[in-house]
Each structure stands twice: as C-alpha cells, then as structure tokens.
C-alpha cells in the first residue's frame, strides 16, 4: 500500500497530515504513535486527517503523538488549513472534535501560507 503523507510545521509544532477525503486511511493508535515517533517514524507532535464533510468544506481529525484523538489547538488548525489550500480547497469552514471553525488564508505561496483562524 502506498501512503501519501505530508509534513507541515507551524510556530514550532510539526504534524503529519493525510488527505483522507476518500476514507483511504483508517489508522490504529499504534500506527499513529509509530508515525509520530522521531526515532522510528516520520516524527511529529501529532497527526491529522483532512476528511470529507457533508455540512462543511472539510473535516479535521487530530491525533496526539500518543495515537489518541485530541482537540484542535491553533497550530494544528492553521497547518491543516494551509494543507487544504495546497490541495486546492478554496473555502475553509470545517468541523473538528471540538466543533465548527472558520479560517481565512491571508497569504498563499508554494512555501508559505498565512492563516487567520
């Protein structure tokens, strides 16, 4: 199985992100923990899934480095919005475990994305 993972960082935190709008990835806590391990995996503070949503532009699932789902903080939300923009998404109303969020991309280049969350 080929896995397409992306690594984003913002304000000192780094994240592994998957585009899961087609529900391709169903990772276990053990797999997430291994991916986030800095010695044996990609290494990250957490992992996110950009998902499909019927009500919003997309959904967000965030997992801490221990493999378990957590709530959104600012840095992960900004990184996911930047990832969504790089994947061609133009509107940024999304739901996460802690509810509805909206964001605005203020600046967008291939290597930099400034997000208001």
Question: Which residues fall in each region the model found?
Answer:
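A glycine-rich beta-to-alpha transition motif near the start of alpha/beta enzyme domains, typified by
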Residues: 1-112
